[in-house]
């Protein structure tokens, strides 16, 4: 996969950088694995906005992704690498030996024709899924389970990878993409390799309209609002925010303010927080 730059024929092309989609091998998705996807526009069941700056965008169909990888010891052939509008990673269509078809998150380097498997003692090979207890230290992994059997919940975004640092007792030490070092049950499963579309972080949309196509509405600064609408609003000209620290629209501290609950039960699994030099 690479990136595509454009000649500045129009203002919208001047800063546009897009993926070249060279890894995509099939344009039409597998019909049996599609489901309707209703847009919420950032509203909840009462119709109240719960997520600002969302709405519109191109209509999408949801692709059912196999995050559990629970079809053990049955080889699957990679039939295609496809685009998924609902995530940043590419997805791979697997044809299992028994005839079943499933989508998985495509790891970097997976190609059409490759054979992948999941199970307790499968080979350490890109795309294979197995428990942490059977994966060597130092291996890059993705689609990582938080709890055994629940399915992969972590490390699913484009270009991300976690790394197994070591094992002790019934726990594995894993460094997550954020830098956090955390304990995981050795029976938690993960997929070998790094998530595909590693150049996603270098994409530049080039114009506001392209954000609208993705369902993102303009993100208005608080300082550009009236005082009635935001704590940062009001004042003459470009006024300072007028508070000791930045605040959310609802008056809560933000930008660096710690929001994690004190004495959260899962604290005992976190060995080192992201960007924290000292170990607990």
Swiss-Prot record:
Source domain of life: Bacteria
List the SMART domains. Ribosomal_L2, Ribosomal_L2_C
Against SUPFAM superfamilies, the record matches this protein to:
Nucleic acid-binding proteins, Translation proteins SH3-like domain
Key words of the record: Ribonucleoprotein, Ribosomal protein, RNA-binding, rRNA-binding
What residues form the membrane-spanning segments?
Answer: none
**GO MF terms on file?**
RNA binding; rRNA binding; structural constituent of ribosome; transferase activity
**A GO BP annotation:** cytoplasmic translation
Q: Does the keyword Oxidoreductase apply?
A: no
Instruction: Extract the Pfam families matched here.
Output: Ribosomal_L2 (PF00181), Ribosomal_L2_C (PF03947)
Residue pairs linked by disulfide bridges in the UniProt entry? none
Q: Which GO terms describe its cellular component?
A: large ribosomal subunit
Q: Where is this region: Disordered?
A: 229-280
Tell me, how does this one assemble? Part of the 50S ribosomal subunit. Forms a bridge to the 30S subunit in the 70S ribosome.
What family is this protein classified in?
Belongs to the universal ribosomal protein uL2 family.
- What role does this protein play? One of the primary rRNA binding proteins. Required for association of the 30S and 50S subunits to form the 70S ribosome, for tRNA binding and peptide bond formation. It has been suggested to have peptidyltransferase activity; this is somewhat controversial. Makes several contacts with the 16S rRNA in the 70S ribosome.
- NCBIfam families according to UniProt: rplB_bact
* Entries under PANTHER family matching the protein: LARGE RIBOSOMAL SUBUNIT PROTEIN UL2M (PTHR13691:SF5), RIBOSOMAL PROTEIN L2 (PTHR13691)
Protein's UniProt name: Large ribosomal subunit protein uL2
Organism of origin is Dictyoglomus turgidum (strain DSM 6724 / Z-1310)
Q: Which gene encodes it?
A: rplB
């Amino acid at each position: 996969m690479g990136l595509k730059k454009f000649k500045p024929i129009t203002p919208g092309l001047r800063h546009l950088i897009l993926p070249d989609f060279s890894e995509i091998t099939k344009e039409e998705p597998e019909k049996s694995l599609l489901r309707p996807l209703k847009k919420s526009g950032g509203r909840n069941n009462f119709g109240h906005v719960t997520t600002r700056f969302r709405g519109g965008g191109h209509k999408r169909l949801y692709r059912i992704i196999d995050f559990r990888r629970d079809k053990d010891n049955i080889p699957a052939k990679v039939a295609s690498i496809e685009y998924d509008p609902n995530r940043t990673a590419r997805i791979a269509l697997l044809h299992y030996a028994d005839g079943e078809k499933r989508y998985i998150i495509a790891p970097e380097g997976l190609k059409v024709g490759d054979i992948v498997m999941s199970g307790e003692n499968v080979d350490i090979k890109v795309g294979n899924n197995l428990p942490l207890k059977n994966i060597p230290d130092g291996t890059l992994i993705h689609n990582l389970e938080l709890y055994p059997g629940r399915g992969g919940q972590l490390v699913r975004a484009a270009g991300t990878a976690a790394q197994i640092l070591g094992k002790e007792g019934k726990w594995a030490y894993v460094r997550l993409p954020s830098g956090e070092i955390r304990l995981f049950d050795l029976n938690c499963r993960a997929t070998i390799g790094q998530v595909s579309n590693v150049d996603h972080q270098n994409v530049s949309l080039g114009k506001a309209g392209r954000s609208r196509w993705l369902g993102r509405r303009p993100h208005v600064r608080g300082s550009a609002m009236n005082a009635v609408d935001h704590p940062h609003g009001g004042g003459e000209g470009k006024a300072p925010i007028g508070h000791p620290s930045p605040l959310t629209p609802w008056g809560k501290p933000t930008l660096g303010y710690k929001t994690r609950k004190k004495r959260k039960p899962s604290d005992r699994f976190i060995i080192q927080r992201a960007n924290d030099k000292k170990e607990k």
